[in-house]
């Protein structure tokens, strides 16, 4: 039997729906899926999910993404709140599967609120607002979290897209060196390569439409109604290029 005949014959093989469905689950993408994160949050959170999400975002912004470690240095009231959230949402600290929730996934799924909240807690972030201002005057606070990448609209004019991305990278370099000291002696390109893949994945995500992203960027003051970047964004991008 020729290979062609084998291929033709194989086309008549039966398709068992239940078996195929099982394979789909087994092979499902294990990375970040914002829709799945939101579905899990709503399912596990009940009526209070919105308030809980705000708590978890502030927690992630100010204390990181590992609940089991952060509670070691926290008030009794804070510990109780964190432990309640961990139990309620089944929060994981590392190596999550598709149906696991982490603080970082929640901040990314709700990036619009995360980036607004960054302004309010700027002095409690790993890299503070004052620290960024020392590098680039009036640095955009909304860019001061990795989740901002999920709001960048790649359908903006090329020069605007580039300015916004480079301005965000300026923060990401400082953030990466702060949370990973081993990067501090590396070149700009080497540090960028450490966060470039997840950043590009967030930018390329189809979760938010171009229109939604632009609306959020306007709300955050990153671009105006004419799609022009703010002066602080342009300045930050210029500093990034000069590194």
From Swiss-Prot:
<keyword id="KW-1139">Helical capsid protein</keyword>
<keyword id="KW-0946">Virion</keyword>
<dbReference type="GO" id="GO:0044177">
    <property type="term" value="C:host cell Golgi apparatus"/>
</dbReference>
<comment type="subunit">
    <text>Homodimer. Homohexamer; ring-shaped, necessary to form the nucleocapsid. Homopentamers; opened pentamers in solution. Binds to viral genomic RNA. Interacts with glycoprotein Gn; this interaction allows packaging of nucleocapsids into virions.</text>
</comment>
<feature type="binding site">
    <location>
        <position position="204"/>
    </location>
    <ligand>
        <name>RNA</name>
    </ligand>
</feature>
<keyword id="KW-0694">RNA-binding</keyword>
<dbReference type="GO" id="GO:0042025">
    <property type="term" value="C:host cell nucleus"/>
</dbReference>
<comment type="similarity">
    <text>Belongs to the phlebovirus nucleocapsid protein family.</text>
</comment>
<comment type="function">
    <text>Encapsidates the genomic RNA, protecting it from nucleases. Displays high affinity for single-stranded nucleic acid. The encapsidated genomic RNA is termed the nucleocapsid (NC) or ribonucleoprotein. The ribonucleoprotein has a non-helical structure. Serves as template for viral transcription and replication. After replication, the nucleocapsid is recruited to the host Golgi apparatus by glycoprotein Gn for packaging into virus particles.</text>
</comment>
<keyword id="KW-1035">Host cytoplasm</keyword>
<feature type="site" description="RNA-binding">
    <location>
        <position position="105"/>
    </location>
</feature>
<keyword id="KW-0167">Capsid protein</keyword>
<dbReference type="InterPro" id="IPR009522">
    <property type="entry name" value="Capsid_Phlebovir/Tenuivir"/>
</dbReference>
<feature type="site" description="RNA-binding">
    <location>
        <position position="65"/>
    </location>
</feature>
<feature type="binding site">
    <location>
        <position position="32"/>
    </location>
    <ligand>
        <name>RNA</name>
    </ligand>
</feature>
<protein>
    <recommendedName>
        <fullName>Nucleoprotein</fullName>
    </recommendedName>
</protein>
<keyword id="KW-1040">Host Golgi apparatus</keyword>
<keyword id="KW-0687">Ribonucleoprotein</keyword>
<feature type="binding site">
    <location>
        <position position="184"/>
    </location>
    <ligand>
        <name>RNA</name>
    </ligand>
</feature>
<feature type="binding site">
    <location>
        <position position="29"/>
    </location>
    <ligand>
        <name>RNA</name>
    </ligand>
</feature>
<dbReference type="GO" id="GO:1990904">
    <property type="term" value="C:ribonucleoprotein complex"/>
</dbReference>
<dbReference type="Pfam" id="PF05733">
    <property type="entry name" value="Tenui_N"/>
</dbReference>
<feature type="binding site">
    <location>
        <position position="197"/>
    </location>
    <ligand>
        <name>RNA</name>
    </ligand>
</feature>
<keyword id="KW-0543">Viral nucleoprotein</keyword>
<feature type="site" description="RNA-binding">
    <location>
        <position position="98"/>
    </location>
</feature>
<dbReference type="InterPro" id="IPR015971">
    <property type="entry name" value="Nucleocapsid_Phlebovirus"/>
</dbReference>
<dbReference type="GO" id="GO:0044172">
    <property type="term" value="C:host cell endoplasmic reticulum-Golgi intermediate compartment"/>
</dbReference>
<feature type="binding site">
    <location>
        <position position="194"/>
    </location>
    <ligand>
        <name>RNA</name>
    </ligand>
</feature>
<feature type="binding site">
    <location>
        <position position="105"/>
    </location>
    <ligand>
        <name>RNA</name>
    </ligand>
</feature>
<dbReference type="GO" id="GO:0003723">
    <property type="term" value="F:RNA binding"/>
</dbReference>
<keyword id="KW-1048">Host nucleus</keyword>
<feature type="binding site">
    <location>
        <position position="104"/>
    </location>
    <ligand>
        <name>RNA</name>
    </ligand>
</feature>
<feature type="site" description="RNA-binding">
    <location>
        <position position="29"/>
    </location>
</feature>
<feature type="site" description="RNA-binding">
    <location>
        <position position="32"/>
    </location>
</feature>
<feature type="binding site">
    <location>
        <position position="66"/>
    </location>
    <ligand>
        <name>RNA</name>
    </ligand>
</feature>
<dbReference type="GO" id="GO:0019029">
    <property type="term" value="C:helical viral capsid"/>
</dbReference>
<feature type="site" description="RNA-binding">
    <location>
        <position position="66"/>
    </location>
</feature>
<dbReference type="GO" id="GO:0019013">
    <property type="term" value="C:viral nucleocapsid"/>
</dbReference>
């Amino acid at each position: 039997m020729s290979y062609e005949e084998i291929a033709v014959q194989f086309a008549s093989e039966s398709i068992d729906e239940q078996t195929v469905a099982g394979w789909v689950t087994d092979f499902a993408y294990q990375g970040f899926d914002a829709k799945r994160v939101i579905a899990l949050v709503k399912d596990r959170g009940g009526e209070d999910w919105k308030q809980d999400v705000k708590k978890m975002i502030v927690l992630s912004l100010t204390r990181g993404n590992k609940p089991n470690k952060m509670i070691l240095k926290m008030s009794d009231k804070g510990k109780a709140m964190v432990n309640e959230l961990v139990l309620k949402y089944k929060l994981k600290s590392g190596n999550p599967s598709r149906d696991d929730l982490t603080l970082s996934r929640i901040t990314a799924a709700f990036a619009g609120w995360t980036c607004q909240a960054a302004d309010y807690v700027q002095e409690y972030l790993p890299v503070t607002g004052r620290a960024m201002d020392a590098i680039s005057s009036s640095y955009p606070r909304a860019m001061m979290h990795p989740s901002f990448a999920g709001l960048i609209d790649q359908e903006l004019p090329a020069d605007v897209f580039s300015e916004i991305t480079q301005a965000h990278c300026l923060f990401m370099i400082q953030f990466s060196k702060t949370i990973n000291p081993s990067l501090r002696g590396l070149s700009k390109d080497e540090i960028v390569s450490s966060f470039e893949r997840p950043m590009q994945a967030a930018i390329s995500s189809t979760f938010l439409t171009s229109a939604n992203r632009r609306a959020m960027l306007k709300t955050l003051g990153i671009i105006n109604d004419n799609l022009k970047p703010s002066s602080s964004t342009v300045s930050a991008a210029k500093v990034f290029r000069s590194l």
